[in-house]
Regions:
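Conserved beta-loop-beta connector loops within the AMP-binding
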Residues: 363-390, 410, 427-429
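Gly/Ser/Thr-rich phosphate-binding loop
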Residues: 244, 267-275, 285-355, 368, ...
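AMP-binding/adenylate-forming catalytic core of the ANL superfamily
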Residues: 98, 104-105, 115-119, 273, ...
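Structural core segment of the AMP-binding/adenylate-forming
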Residues: 15-16, 58-59, 86-164, 175
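Conserved AMP-binding/adenylate-forming core of the ANL superfamily
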Residues: 28-74, 78-82, 99-104, 160-161
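ATP-dependent adenylate-forming carboxylate-activation enzymes
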Residues: 71-72, 89-107, 119-124, 247-268, ...
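Conserved AMP-binding/adenylation subdomain of ANL enzymes
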Residues: 204-223, 231-271, 286, 337
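Conserved adenylate-forming
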Residues: 56-61, 166-178, 183-225, 237, ...
Length: 474
């Protein structure tokens, strides 16, 4: 017997329309590549997203056609997230830090039909546009006045001209929630990059999971600064979670130096920020050099690589900011675990609490995980034995785009598991600790040695800004 609840598809268009209706005056603030600060509301963002959808219809793009971006975090990129996916196409975020030949390969492999780019990336686009054979429309994310007179790119149009000719009246289509919504390619350290193709369903469920109190804890009372780029795994899903909860969004654009990030945090009363350790290192150095303090920042999410214990201590003891140590990967949309102390930890001394906080945390609801030995046997959650980390869940890939690399999963009696390539321990409370990447771990004197542990020891020295440990045969 089935339940008698309405079967409403989980679609990304529903997020932006919910935000426009229920959080209509919620702010979205962006530092633009032009240097000024732009601000508007969720209601205005929704209207402009509909203009994007109409512009794509006018181009004749089919359902599931790919629309690529080469862009920083900003309001126009935000509009593309919703206008592209909401209209049934797929937003494909390309990492502009890749080599031009990799960008060409990715764009052609994805069969991108439109490519939208920030003007700071015009030199890259000039180098690749003639080789991107499937792209029929190039769009510069600026107004007509900011578009250079002679770009050398055939048919290039300014974004504001492109959507300015369209109506903001648009009826979002209804379709299968399992339809593709976004595409992001892995780094391709072992060959060509492979695409992770996210669905509407997986993206909405990921937004639900990420907004939970024991995950990122987003709410309408927050002002959120995603420093993690929108071209990398959808900025960890924060734009979707913010629309779901009505949180104020603050986009930093291209200015990611410590001074610029600090000024934006203070000016926009940011309460929650998210980024990789290198960004926070620059911020902390700037603050220390100038004797600065935070007036509103409460929490910062640190992921992308293991957070050094010294950074957690500095944020907590010097600035009163709680670090949420998180872990995930492109193939996981990306959120897997977030570290929050449990009630029983609150009475522990500082050293005992730090032993918990340096871990990557517990699984967000929706993510299942286990560690296995080389023969595939599951290992106990004792916090001591390490093994290969496997995961499964509704926002974790089942295969790569176009089947690249074959079947990536491991299949056993418990289901289909994605091998993360990480080596980890899990303690009895479910706290995950990544001890290494399986390809980085060092064996010396018959013992396995964690490069992460060695790096953290080095970074703890006040004279060391950052460190990387490499194994060298001898």
């Amino acid at each position: 017997m089935l339940g008698l609840m309405q079967d409403q598809p989980l679609l990304i268009s529903g997020l932006i329309e919910f935000a426009a209706r229920h959080h209509h005056d919620g702010e979205i603030v962006s530092r633009r590549v032009e240097g000024d600060v732009h601000r508007y509301t969720y209601r205005e963002a929704a209207a402009r997203s509909r203009r994007v959808a109409n512009a794509l219809d006018r181009l004749g793009l089919a359902f599931s056609d790919r629309v690529a971006t080469l862009a920083w975090n900003g309001y126009r990129h935000f509009e593309l997230y919703f206008g592209v996916a909401g209209s049934g196409r797929v937003v494909h975020t390309i990492n502009p830090r890749l080599a031009p030949e990799q960008i060409v390969w990715i764009a052609n492999h994805a069969e991108d039909r439109v490519l939208c780019f920030d003007t700071t990336f015009l030199p890259i686009v000039r180098a690749v546009w003639s080789k991107c054979t499937t792209v029929k429309q190039w769009v510069a994310l600026c107004d007509g006045a900011a578009l250079p007179a002679d770009t050398g790119i055939d048919g290039l149009v300014a974004y504001e001209d492109w959507i300015g000719a369209e109506s903001d009246a648009y009826r979002w289509p209804t379709f299968d929630e399992r339809s593709a919504a976004a595409l992001c390619y892995t780094s391709g350290t072992t060959g060509n990059p492979k695409g992770a193709l996210y669905s509407h369903r997986s993206t909405i469920l990921h937004a639900y999971g990420g907004a939970l109190p024991d995950a990122l804890g987003m709410s309408a009372r927050d002002s959120i600064l995603p420093v993690v780029p929108m071209f990398h795994v959808n900025a960890w899903g924060i734009p979707y979670g913010a629309a779901m909860t009505g949180a104020k969004l603050v986009f930093p654009g291209a200015a990611l130096d410590g001074k610029s990030v600090y000024e934006l945090i203070e000016a926009e009363k940011v309460t929650l920020a998210a980024g990789v350790p290198t960004v926070w290192l620059g911020l902390l150095n700037h603050m220390e050099q100038h004797g600065l303090r935070f007036s509103t920042l409460q929490r910062t999410v640190i992921g992308g690589s293991a957070c050094p214990p010294a950074m957690i201590t500095t944020f907590k003891d010097r600035y009163g900011v709680t670090v949420l140590h998180a872990w995930g990967m492109t193939e996981m949309s990306p959120l897997g675990t977030v570290c929050h102390l449990k009630n029983k930890h609150l009475g522990l001394d500082e050293a005992a609490q730090m032993a918990v906080l340096v871990k990557q945390g517990r699984a967000v609801y929706g993510v299942e995980m286990k560690i296995v030995d080389p023969e595939g046997r599951e290992l106990p959650w004792d916090g001591r034995q390490s093994g290969d980390l496997l995961v499964k869940g509704p926002w974790i890939i089942s295969s790569y785009f176009k089947g690249e690399g074959g079947d990536p999963l491991r299949h056993d009696a418990d289901g289909d598991w994605f091998p993360t390539g990480d080596v980890a321990t899990i303690d009895p409370d479910g706290f995950l600790q990544i001890t290494d990447r399986s390809k980085d771990v060092i064996k010396s004197g018959g013992e396995w040695i964690s490069t992460i542990d060695l790096e953290n020891l080095a970074i703890a020295h006040p004279a060391v800004a950052n460190a990387a440990v490499l194994g060298v045969p001898h």
